[in-house]
């Protein structure tokens, strides 16, 4: 309820005041009530009466009307007769007038004083009534003057920002008060044509700029108040001082900067101006001393400047006009002439007082202090803006950058599946991985003379004096069945010791399952990369289309100085070329024959000294082979005794039947040799023809130590060995017995290991096949027989063997043949019959790289065709 009562009371009071403010007129008798006072037609005071309009029935003879403090907002037009108004003083101060025009007072032609102070006036218009009105037409002459008697206009304490426009229309205006407003600057035409203006009050404004020609036409100007403003520059005021030498000016409370212009104009300004400037500059200098702490000397009146003659300043002339009141005269010329005088006086600025120079220095120091602050502010703003922009860009562009990165990663991911493969080094290995049959891989590798080994391990050789371990074909079976022992039929003459030795070799190979792969790969590569040093017979024979009769073997076991151990392999024994086992058998034949001949020739002459020489030769061979960087698998085996080697040689290499057609050991030679594989068919037993007594292996060695041969045998021992070998053919067995007795003392390892070594082969038929189209021929899968034709000068027998099983494309050996070349097919297997090797070792040479060239063993046969016989004879001559 209380809130309701309060609301009702508020509404009633508001309506009451609203009715008072909106009341437009009063009755005619209100003029004479006690609210307004008048003094016999002289003064009418209606201030603080609360009236909102000018009284309409005031006395026409009243000279002054005071309607101040009546909350006037708009001055309305009077309803009285225009002819009756005699008002001279109108006070409208302390009201709420915000905008005013002087048109309502146009009928007050006698008005002299208009007070509009203490209002909210921010705009003042001096436009009068339109000339179309009847009253203006009747009083045209008086209206033209537009307040002809208005002398005082008071506009102080309002909200003016500029000087009122159109003041020149007030022709009789003598005093103008614009103090306590918000005026910023004075325009050069604001007081133009105000010829009667004497007093101008502009104090307490915000004026910071006054042009020198602003008061140019104010000839009667006597007093000007510019105190409490924002004026700084002295030069415009000096020009005004030159134009109005007797002008009373109040310049206090401004931010004057006293410069050299004060000293320049000391002798040209009036005494009053000089005193004022001295006071102003001393005050400003004192304030600077108090603020800066730097003592400054005051400008004294006795400060003398260089004499300046007035005749040089033609621009300064005396004004002819004199004021009647004081009889004072001022010499003022035009603004342009005074500017020239000022520019001429600036040339004397070098000899300025110390105070003036110090003031300039203070200003420069202030500017220098402000410069770092501005720089710091600029840097801070730039850093902030940069951070803001970078943050915005990062926030908006991050999703797009992530998407682009994901797309880039996805585009690169398929490329990871493309595994790198070095075709130059691993083309054969990749081919072996893709082909299911290793034999087919060998067929692909051999015709192209691949320089690298496949995944099938080879025989690994290690140099060792007087020791040769060559497991027979039962090694393949021992890999499959480690516990099984070798049958007597398979072991030949040494059935008892073969099983133990094979088990020892197998156990060693089990400890090194991949040693053969690594060791033989490096050995085969080193052997192939040094084809030129090993001898030129391989490529020369292909280029000249000559039959091959000898093969150089880069394994040191051929010379009797290394162990030959087959590497462990996960493939079946038929994956490798069986002919290579025949080659190592032939190489062992040569080694044993060489040892036998050497022991036979030297046993009678040197006796016990033969063994020491042989040991030294073996040690030198071992050092030479180590230096050739051939990585070999070191397998410590007992050295074979000379007696076992001689017994194996005297046995004429008995022929043993196959125990298992698939049980073939890995080849000792890498697939670099240009030799084919000859397999005896299963449906045909090997036939041994007559073997002459002169088919023993012959030895021929080059013992020139200057050429760096493998064995540094003396020429005497070499010739003796060769001669003894040739003479000892009839009584071969007796010499073997003698040499066996001489070498039995040098055996330091297991003697039974040699008994396991059985040199077996199927005498193959060597056949030279020529391609009419001069292209490599691959053996047909359905061919069941392979023949080998060889002729030796002393051999006329022919041995022909057939494979116990037909050759298939999967396990068929190499059948590539070159025109003009012999392709020798060798095969070693366990045969049930005893066969003899007919070896021709006439050209056993030792190369400079410790590789022994040897002639592959082959059973000699007499060709049935005379042409073939002649051809074989020529080949044997070449081999010799």
Curated annotation (Swiss-Prot):
Residues 319-368, 463-504, 679-746, 764-816, 855-880 are annotated as: Disordered. It is a multi-pass membrane protein. It holds the Pfam family LRR_8. The modification Phosphoserine is found at residues 723, 752. The keyword Ubl conjugation does not apply. Residues 483-493, 737-746 have a biased composition (Polar residues). Signal peptide: none annotated. It is found in: Membrane. PROSITE patterns: LRR. InterPro entries: Leu-rich_rpt (IPR001611), Leu-rich_rpt_typical-subtyp (IPR003591), LRR_dom_sf (IPR032675), LRR_TM_domain-containing (IPR050541). Glycans are attached at residues 45, 115, 746, 756. One of its GO terms (cellular component) is membrane. Residues 709-720 have a biased composition (Low complexity). Coiled coil: none annotated. The keyword Kinase does not apply. Residues 788-800, 865-880 have a biased composition (Basic and acidic residues). Residues 697-707 have a biased composition (Acidic residues). Keywords: Glycoprotein, Leucine-rich repeat, Membrane, Phosphoprotein, Repeat, Transmembrane, Transmembrane helix. The chain crosses the membrane at residues 4-24, 376-396. Residues 337-354 have a biased composition (Basic residues). LRR repeats lie at residues 86-107, 110-130, 149-171, 172-193, 196-217, 220-241. This is Leucine-rich repeat-containing protein 66.
